[in-house]
């Protein structure tokens, strides 16, 4: 029941958002505001629709790691432009402030995307991205893992409480991440380089050695998990 309800709600949500984005764009055109309005269509993560035998999000694989991000900025961003730079939702605040002509605080996380949207990617722009999921045990039952990607390759480590496994994917030859190449001699230098970058990212981000308690409840004795197992959260027919 959970999968059926989840996916149906998800598809209904997409249809509703699509319809109402269309209404908003029509309004901007009708009122003449479109020429002086920046429209950004985005999400906080991707979503699985059966890939890797999964639905929902949480894993580091491409289907949920990648996030929709479309920009319409008349006179600034060239229509039809596709950019493959690594950006993140942490960049949004700086971007919106700069677009609005407001001061961007020096201590804010993320960087403004305005130069990229103008077609001028800074030479020192990020070339890798770190991801970390630690909400286990929890009723989603997604194992703790972290990893790093440079857009071409992705290194992942699954850890605790009883696993210590690595995966490495070549996203050019294996875009769906079906076959890990971790440990293969021809990828030795790539693997070593990504491990070095992974450790660097963890230092820079000050990732604690010990994870905080899972935020979604943990294990068979968790009140949250118990309610789910007993069917107390099932929808009424």
For each predicted feature, which ranges?
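C-terminal cap/loop subdomain of S1 sulfatases and analogous C-terminal strand-loop tails that border
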Residues: 45-51, 90-93, 98-167, 171, ...
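Histidine-centered active-site microenvironments of extracellular/periplasmic hydrolases
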Residues: 26-81, 88, 139
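A long, amphipathic alpha-helix that forms part
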Residues: 1-37
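Beta-strand elements within well-structured catalytic alpha/beta cores of enzymes
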Residues: 14-17, 21, 38-43, 69-71, ...
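Active-site rim elements
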Residues: 1-12, 56, 76-87, 99-104, ...
């Amino acid at each position: 029941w959970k999968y059926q309800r989840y996916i149906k709600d998800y598809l209904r949500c997409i249809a509703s958002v699509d319809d109402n984005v269309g209404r908003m764009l029509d309004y901007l055109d009708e009122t003449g505001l479109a020429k002086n309005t920046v429209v950004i269509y985005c999400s906080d993560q991707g979503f699985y629709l059966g890939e890797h035998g999964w639905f929902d999000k949480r894993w580091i694989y491409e289907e949920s790691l990648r996030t929709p991000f479309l920009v319409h900025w008349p006179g600034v961003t060239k229509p039809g432009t596709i950019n493959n730079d690594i950006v993140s939702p942490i960049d949004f605040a700086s971007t919106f402030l700069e677009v609005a002509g407001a001061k961007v605080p020096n201590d804010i996380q993320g960087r403004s995307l305005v130069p990229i949207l103008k077609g001028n990617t800074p030479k020192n722009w990020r070339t890798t991205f770190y991801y970390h999921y630690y909400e286990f045990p929890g009723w989603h039952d997604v194992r703790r893992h972290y990893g790093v990607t440079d857009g071409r390759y992705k290194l992942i480590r699954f850890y605790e409480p009883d696993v210590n496994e690595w995966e490495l994917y070549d996203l050019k030859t294996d875009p769906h991440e079906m076959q890990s190449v971790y440990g293969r001699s021809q990828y030795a230098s790539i693997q070593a380089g990504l491990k070095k970058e992974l450790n660097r990212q963890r230092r820079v981000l000050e990732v604690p050695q010990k994870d905080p308690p899972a935020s979604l409840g943990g294990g068979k004795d968790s009140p949250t998990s118990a309610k789910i197992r007993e069917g107390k959260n099932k929808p009424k027919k």
